[in-house]
Amino acid sequence: MKLFDVYPLFDVNIVKGKGCHVWDDKGQEYLDLYGGHAVISIGHAHPHYVETISKQVATLGFYSNSVINKLQQEVADRLGAISGYDDYQLFLINSGAEANENALKLASFYNGRTRVISFAKAFHGRTSLAVEVTNNPKIIAPINDNGHVTYLPLNDTEALKAELAKGDVCAVIIEGIQGVGGIQLPSTEFMKAIRQACDETNTVMILDEIQSGYGRSGKFFAHQYNDVRPDMITVAKGIGNGFPMAGVLISPKFTPVYGQLGTTFGGNHLACAAAIAVLDVMKAENLVENAAKVGTHLLDELKGFKGIKEVRGRGLMIGMEFEEPIKELRQKLLFEEKVFTGVSGTNVIRLLPPLCLSMNEADEFLTRLHRLIK
């Protein structure tokens, strides 16, 4: 059987990782400034993470959500404490798309409406509702194009107010920082306008923190820079450091009903062990603070590079926009300088390294980049 060929692949076979470095099958070492699409939060093969999930899988890897799993409550308690959302409820699933899918579904259960506001360049996933609120017609199949979504320009407060004033909007879904859209930041004024308009119209505010959350921005959630509290927050990627896991943080105003939401694998014992290990390391090694410190250093230094048109971001979620397409530059970074980076569109390179990136590793990246664009 052949693999279904949907991924354009680099000719690199990564077989080992440690911290912010990975190695291919020829023994070549690379500096990982992408973390597998922002997934690696505490670093590759962290000893505590390896030990925790190894012990768990040797004891019990999985049983269904028909029995008590005390690890789920431990994840909820720990996540609530570190994030500042200890009064919220947690629903555990497997992926970011699934998190957004369930958040939108719950919002519609709540107010009975079907129209959703999303934003230009938004990305929220590839499943039914999640892809419909993603502003990319190329990945929306006809069966997903159901007319539920109105796309608005990011940071256009007047357009937002006008749409919500119609009284038929189920939810507004917005990323804490747009990732696939090129590291675009919503303004504090705009975020507060969303919160106020949602309150006035019984509309649900959903914050997609799948890429921007879990400490990546230098705060636990990127929206905490904007001083708002959404009705739901979706998380994935960094929550499991590579183990498939996701969650929806849900306001107390939502009352759960048996059977309303469900999942086979979500919140399984092994996934919870991975999530607990991640939270252990984040706290012990002050990784949120490290993301803020090292990220600020990178942002400040990159803004001094003459070849870069604009640098955007917060913490270790950084976009570098160039005047010219960056395909060749990204390939040179990988194959000549041995650095993994990401991309957005044709002109933006994204940096999404593990949160344990050191100052020395950041400076090493700057040196390698400078050799290519000096």
Q: In which residue ranges do the predicted regions lie?
A:
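Conserved N-terminal phosphate-binding loop of PLP-dependent enzymes in the Aspartate aminotransferase
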Residues: 1-374
